[in-house]
């Protein structure tokens, strides 16, 4: 690669080294394509550096602290002391290990790595602005391009992140001390996961949500289990309110929230906090690409529409991950990255979003895949459902975590599995079994007749499938 006015070329240009981008680059290199990967920050993107991995590290650490302090029922008496700075250092070590691992994987695969930013000059060329030693720029022609620039936290008016008291999820993963009082704006999955972390660590947590339910994208019977557990941890919810403004007072922030619907609430509320976490969603990073110069279309929210092969309106330009729209999940981006690389190499490939699982790492966890019962009915199907409560699971009881249930949805005519929802212990792990079943076109009988190890949480999946067939042993059918 020559730096300067010389124009170089590549078979595949990948912009962004998050879960979608680096996977796309490695897969394309495996398929004998010449690949250049451009990244302006740390390898791994938001997921590895400011999202999935660091948040799960803090979720794990806070879980250990919480369980140690609440195990009297088991005859264990402890009063753990949390050194948040040490927990953050451990978290950062995990991130560093994985970041360096990604760089090594890319290098070993033969991917050409560039540190810098990319701006489209036209639909076949970008300008690379280098960072670090040897700063400069160059033009790079490409046969195909994969845009994987990810997303960033949404700011709301009046709550800019320039003041240290107002933070996004990025900042909330790097507090130097546990806030005595924390206000979270937004009860989606990010807000609820971080409410779980800091309530476990001892913060007085208040959550403001515009709608009348925590986790509003989930069914109420699932969300209510998580909300009730959060309330037992001390989280205070204010539903039907929006954050209006804030003011500094005695070193703290006083937030004013107004009713989202004046018919439901007749007065404003004020909440005092050391930190205010704004967790109202994420927006795509497309505004730095000069994307119009490539002729790539975006929608009103800035996302890049794609088809099932991850193609944009330009046949040789692809988009994967958060920048391509909901659901914004790291593993979705990785799968899309694989598909885009394979399509570029001439292989038949497409993304099956029906078998795409999702997880929320609250307490208890949530895992979902495929259709809900209502979604299936709205598509003209006749769904049949089976459920099994963890209260009847020997393994859940022996883990002292018997909240929640497994629900499986299938078509009545064929008994083909089309969806599932799990709320309970290890839901994020359990949902993968049902995702695999959907991917394979499996039926309820396939799950129900598969012997599951006893005692395990996975037995609940077998029992739920059998319940849908009126053959469950450990519950009424």
From Swiss-Prot:
Subcellular location: Cytoplasm
InterPro entries with a match to the protein in the record: Class-I_Pyr_Nuc-Dis_Oxidored, FAD/NAD-bd_sf, FAD/NAD-binding_dom, FAD/NAD-linked_Rdtase_dimer_sf, Lipoamide_DH, Pyr_nuc-diS_OxRdtase, Pyr_nucl-diS_OxRdtase_dimer, Pyr_OxRdtase_I_AS
Record note on cofactor: Binds 1 FAD per subunit.
Needed co-factor(s): FAD
Family matches, as PROSITE patterns: PYRIDINE_REDOX_1 (PS00076)
Catalytic machinery residues: 454
Reaction catalysed by this enzyme: N(6)-[(R)-dihydrolipoyl]-L-lysyl-[protein] + NAD(+) = N(6)-[(R)-lipoyl]-L-lysyl-[protein] + NADH + H(+)
Pfam families named among the record's database cross-references: Pyr_redox_2, Pyr_redox_dim
Keywords: Cytoplasm, Disulfide bond, FAD, Flavoprotein, NAD, Oxidoreductase, Redox-active center
Disulfide bonds: 47-52
Residues noted as binding NAD(+) in the record, renumbered to the chain: 186-190, 209, 279-282
Top-level taxon: Archaea
One cellular component term from this protein's GO annotations in UniProt: cytoplasm
A GO MF term: flavin adenine dinucleotide binding
Binding residues for FAD: 39-47, 56, 118, 322, 330
Class of this enzyme: oxidoreductase
Primary location recorded for the protein, binned into one broad class: cytoplasm
Single GO BP term: 2-oxoglutarate metabolic process
NCBIfam families in UniProt: lipoamide_DH
Subunit structure: Homodimer.
PANTHER family the UniProt entry points to: DIHYDROLIPOYL DEHYDROGENASE, DISULFIDE OXIDOREDUCTASE
General remark: The active site is a redox-active disulfide bond.
Name this protein carries in UniProt: Dihydrolipoyl dehydrogenase 3
Provenance organism: Haloarcula marismortui (strain ATCC 43049 / DSM 3752 / JCM 8966 / VKM B-1809)
């Amino acid at each position: 690669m020559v730096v300067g006015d010389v124009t170089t070329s590549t078979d595949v240009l990948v912009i962004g080294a998050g879960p979608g981008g680096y996977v796309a680059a490695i897969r394309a290199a495996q398929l004998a394509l010449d690949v250049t990967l451009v990244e302006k920050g740390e390898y791994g993107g938001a997921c590895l550096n400011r999202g999935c991995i660091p948040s799960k590290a803090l979720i794990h650490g806070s879980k250990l602290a919480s369980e140690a302090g609440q195990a009297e029922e088991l005859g264990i008496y402890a009063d753990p002391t949390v050194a948040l700075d040490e927990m953050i250092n451990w978290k950062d070590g995990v991130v560093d290990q994985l970041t360096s691992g990604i760089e090594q994987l890319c290098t070993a695969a033969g991917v050409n790595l560039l540190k810098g930013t990319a701006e489209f000059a036209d639909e076949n060329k970008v300008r690379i602005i280098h960072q670090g030693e040897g700063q400069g720029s160059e033009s790079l022609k490409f046969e195909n391009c994969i845009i994987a620039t990810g997303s960033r936290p949404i700011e709301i008016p009046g709550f800019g992140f320039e003041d240290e008291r107002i933070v996004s999820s990025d900042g909330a993963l790097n507090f130097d001390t546990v806030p005595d009082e924390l206000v979270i704006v937004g009860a989606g999955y990010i807000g609820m996961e971080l409410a779980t972390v800091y309530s476990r660590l001892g913060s007085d947590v208040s959550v403001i949500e515009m709608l009348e339910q925590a986790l509003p994208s989930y069914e109420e019977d699932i969300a209510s289990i998580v909300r009730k557990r959060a309330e037992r941890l001390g989280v205070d919810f204010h539903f039907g309110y929006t954050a209006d403004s804030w003011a500094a007072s005695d070193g703290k922030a006083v937030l004013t929230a107004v009713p989202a619907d004046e018919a439901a609430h007749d007065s404003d509320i004020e909440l005092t906090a050391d930190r205010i976490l704004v967790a109202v969603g994420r927006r795509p990073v497309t505004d730095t690409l000069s994307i119009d110069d490539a002729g790539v279309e975006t929608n009103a929210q800035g996302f890049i529409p794609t088809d099932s092969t991850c193609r944009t309106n330009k046949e040789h330009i692809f988009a994967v991950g958060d920048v391509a729209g909901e659901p914004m999940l790291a593993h979705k981006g990785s799968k899309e990255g694989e598909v885009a690389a394979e399509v570029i190499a001439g292989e038949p490939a497409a993304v099956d979003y029906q078998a795409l699982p999702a997880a929320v790492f609250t307490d208890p966890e949530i895992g979902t895949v495929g259709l809900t019962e209502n979604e299936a009915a709205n598509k003209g199907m006749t769904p049949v459902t089976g459920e099994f409560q963890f209260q009847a699971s020997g393994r859940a009881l022996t883990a002292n975590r018997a909240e929640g249930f497994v629900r499986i949805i299938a078509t009545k005519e064929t008994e083909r599995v089309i969806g599932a929802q799990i709320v309970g212990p290890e839901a994020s792990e359990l949902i993968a079994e049902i995702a695999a079943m959907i991917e394979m076109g499996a039926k309820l009988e396939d799950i129900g007749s598969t012997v599951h190890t006893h005692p395990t949480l996975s037995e609940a999946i077998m029992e739920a499938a059998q319940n849908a067939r009126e053959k469950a042993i450990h519950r009424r059918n």
